[in-house]
Each structure stands twice: as structure tokens, then as C-alpha cells.
């Protein structure tokens, strides 16, 4: 490199992580699309943080009380996630402020997608997210409006695919995302017809833990104790895959209650707890009250913690109790699990990162984003083993890059963020 260029770039390389983050967080998004439903009180936003690589991607969520700021922060989270999962595109998110339990939900979604279809045709790819289901909501509604697949905007905007390429990529997406799992190694029950979309995120969260132990000290997950927060698709699947590797799930805390078993549940017990869920809720005859579990679980001692419930729930006090109980690694199933107002890295997250190994959300839970990227590759092999193996390799590569920076077991999240942001800022 020319000396002048080095002199120009030098301050940039020295920018501390905090400054990089502030710069990225405070940059105005390129596109904000605002919508007000004509028939109900629903309102919504598409935030496209950037059209990096000609397109942007991010799911559609619905919840009462959601605002534009939440959508904007999630769009920025997606942009960071794409640095790990690929493709090299911008981050986006759609959010609708409406009660998902309201019987008018379907009509709201239909009118929403009618309004945003031009974006989805050209440069924005979406999918399911909180309270919006990929397979039952997004795909059928957008199909009715002439979209071949909710990721079509990325195929057009980023890949600039020719007609035959477009047919291949969209065909792979249509087949792969809803693919029913046929390999007993990847599903708790073949008869239940779970799909790739149901299980891939939780699988990635568990694989992140396995790769962490191998890369930092050549250790195994077997025999390690794990606590799981949240028993939806991500938490329950992560627990199932960890138990399959020999980890001992010693505590589960869910919205309505939980379970604690100090010597750990057997793989078969975890499998049954997975299969017996009601919707996304933990059910068991011996369920403890939320208050009792919340009182006991944080100090019960475990090496692994999987936050996989809603965002911003985990408090500083809970982290301190976990650390005192011999915690070694946190694999973030939830986006932004720590109770900080900051978009990415607040004081609680920073405290955790300084005292234990934190695998950040954009690495640990990038499974679904990675499946989309994989299925847009030319001639993707659509088998359970190929799809799950690809997600596992991508997560491992991201952790390997962080490990090459330092063998320290703290600061893992900070180093991972820094490497991602240098690609974006």
C-alpha cells in the first residue's frame, strides 16, 4: 500500500470498537417506508439500513407497542448478521404495530404485503419473525401478489440473476426453507414433520457452543451443565441438540414457569419436553412457578447459558449469579438478550463479555439467514445434512476468525463485533 493511503487509513484502523459502533448506530438508514392501515389501527415500517450489494434482507415481525426505533435497531442487527451468514447485502426489517392475537391479523398482513410488494420484487427480501410465520403467513400471502418467494428482491437486486438463474435460485428457496426433515440425526421426531425453518436457528445456537469448546481449549460439550431461557423453537431446539451432544440441561425458565434438575435431564426427557410444548410454551406436570424458578435458576450453577426468549431480558444481577456459578459460555439465541437500551453493546452485555465467553447473536443465531444464503447458491444440494452442515461450518468459520485474533476466553463478542463493523463502516 502507498504510504499516503496508509496515513489516510491509519486513524480508521485505530478507531476503537465503541467509536465504530457509535458511527454505525447513528448513521441514518437509507430507506424508511411508513404505512398506516386504512381499516384498523395497525401501522408499520420497513427500515432498510443500506442497499449494500444492491439489496437488503430482514424478517417481518408484529407486536403491540412496536415502534420505528425497534425496527431500525433490528435492521442494523441484520446488517451485522449478513457479514457472517452472507450474502454481502444490507440489513433491513419490517415491523407492524398490532396485536398478533387480534382476529383481524390476517387482513392486516394482506394489506401490508400489498403495500410493500414493489420493494419485495426489486431489492428487499423478507421472511417470518416474531408472531409472523414464514410458512403460514409470508409465503402464501406474497405468492398471491405475484412474488415467487419472499427473498426474490435479493435474487433480483443483489445477484442480478438471469431468468434461468432466477428460476433455479427461487426454486431452491421454495423447496429448501419448507423442507421436512427426513434425517433422524436432525429432528426429535420424524413423524412430527418439522421443517428446516423450525429447527435451524436452535441447531446453530447449539453448534456455536460445540465449536466454542473445540476452538478454545479443545474441549467437549459432554457433561457440561446448561441453563436455557425460553422454550420456543430456538431454546427448545438448542437444548435438544446440546443434550444430543451429552450436555446436561439442568434448568429451563419460560414465561409461565420452569424446571430445575440439578443432575440434568436425560436426552429422552428433553425430547419429550420439546415435543409436548403447547405452541411455544413449556408444559410439564411438575412445572415450577415462574417466581420460584426465577429465584433459584440463576444461582443453580452451569457452564452454558442459552438466552433464547425475548430481547433485553437478562439483567446484570443474573449475569453476576451465573458467573459465580462457574459459567463458561453464553450462546445468544435471542437478539440483544441483555437488558440494555443500546442497539448492540450496552453495559450489561459488556460486563458479561469481560467476565465470560459471549457468542454474540449475529454469530450464534444466524442459522436462518445462512439457509437463505445457501439456497441462493448455484446448484445447492437440498438435503438435511447439506443444509445443517453448511450452517454449522459458517458459524465455525466466524468463531475461528475471532479465535485467530486472540485465545482469550473473554472479549469474544467485542472482537467479533469489531471484525464485522470493519466491513460495514
Question: Which residue stretches match the model-derived regions?
Answer:
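Hydrophobic alpha-helical signal peptides and transmembrane signal-/tail-anchor segments
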Residues: 7-15
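Short, Gly/Pro- and small/polar-rich lid/capping loops
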Residues: 16-34
Amino acid at each position: 500500500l502507498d504510504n499516503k493511503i496508509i496515513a489516510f487509513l491509519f486513524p480508521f484502523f485505530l478507531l476503537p470498537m465503541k467509536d465504530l459502533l457509535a458511527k454505525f448506530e447513528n448513521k441514518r438508514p437509507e430507506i424508511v417506508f411508513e404505512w398506516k392501515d386504512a381499516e384498523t389501527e395497525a401501522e408499520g415500517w420497513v427500515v432498510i439500513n443500506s442497499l449494500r450489494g444492491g439489496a437488503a434482507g430482514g424478517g417481518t415481525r408484529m407486536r403491540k407497542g412496536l415502534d420505528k426505533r425497534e425496527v431500525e435497531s433490528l435492521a442494523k442487527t441484520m446488517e451485522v448478521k449478513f457479514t457472517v451468514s452472507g450474502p454481502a447485502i444490507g440489513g433491513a426489517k419490517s415491523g407492524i404495530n398490532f396485536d398478533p392475537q387480534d382476529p383481524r391479523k390476517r387482513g392486516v398482513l394482506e394489506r401490508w404485503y400489498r403495500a410493500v410488494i414493489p420493494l419485495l420484487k426489486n431489492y428487499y427480501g423478507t421472511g417470518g419473525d416474531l408472531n409472523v410465520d414464514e410458512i403460514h403467513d409470508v409465503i402464501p400471502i406474497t405468492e398471491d401478489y405475484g412474488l415467487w418467494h419472499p427473498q426474490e428482491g435479493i435474487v433480483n437486486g443483489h445477484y442480478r440473476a438471469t431468468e434461468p438463474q432466477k428460476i433455479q435460485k427461487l426454486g431452491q428457496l421454495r423447496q429448501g426453507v419448507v423442507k421436512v426433515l427426513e434425517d433422524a440425526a436432525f429432528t426429535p421426531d420424524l413423524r412430527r414433520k418439522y421443517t428446516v425453518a423450525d429447527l435451524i436457528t436452535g441447531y446453530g445456537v447449539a453448534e456455536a457452543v460445540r465449536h466454542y469448546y473445540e476452538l478454545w481449549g479443545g474441549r467437549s460439550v459432554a457433561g457440561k451443565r446448561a441453563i436455557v431461557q425460553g422454550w420456543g423453537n430456538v431454546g427448545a431446539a438448542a437444548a435438544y441438540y446440546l443434550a444430543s451432544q451429552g450436555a446436561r440441561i439442568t434448568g429451563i425458565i419460560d414465561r409461565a414457569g420452569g424446571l430445575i434438575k440439578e443432575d440434568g435431564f436425560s436426552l429422552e426427557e428433553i425430547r419429550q419436553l420439546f415435543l409436548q410444548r403447547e405452541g411455544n410454551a413449556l408444559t410439564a406436570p411438575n412445572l415450577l412457578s415462574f417466581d420460584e424458578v426465577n429465584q433459584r435458576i440463576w444461582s443453580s450453577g452451569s457452564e452454558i447459558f442459552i438466552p433464547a426468549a425475548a430481547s433485553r431480558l437478562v439483567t446484570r444481577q443474573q449475569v453476576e449469579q451465573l458467573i459465580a456459578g462457574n459459567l463458561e459460555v453464553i450462546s445468544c439465541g435471542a437478539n440483544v438478550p441483555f437488558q440494555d437500551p443500546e442497539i448492540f453493546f450496552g453495559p450489561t452485555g459488556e460486563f458479561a463479555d469481560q467476565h465470560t465467553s459471549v457468542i454474540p447473536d449475529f454469530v450464534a443465531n444466524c442459522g436462518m439467514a445462512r439457509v437463505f444464503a445457501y439456497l441462493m447458491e448455484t446448484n445447492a444440494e437440498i438435503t438435511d445434512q447439506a443444509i445443517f452442515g453448511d450452517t454449522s461450518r459458517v458459524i465455525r468459520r466466524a468463531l475461528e476468525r475471532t479465535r485467530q485474533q486472540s485465545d482469550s476466553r473473554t472479549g469474544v463478542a467485542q472482537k467479533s463485533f469489531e471484525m464485522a463493523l470493519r466491513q460495514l463502516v
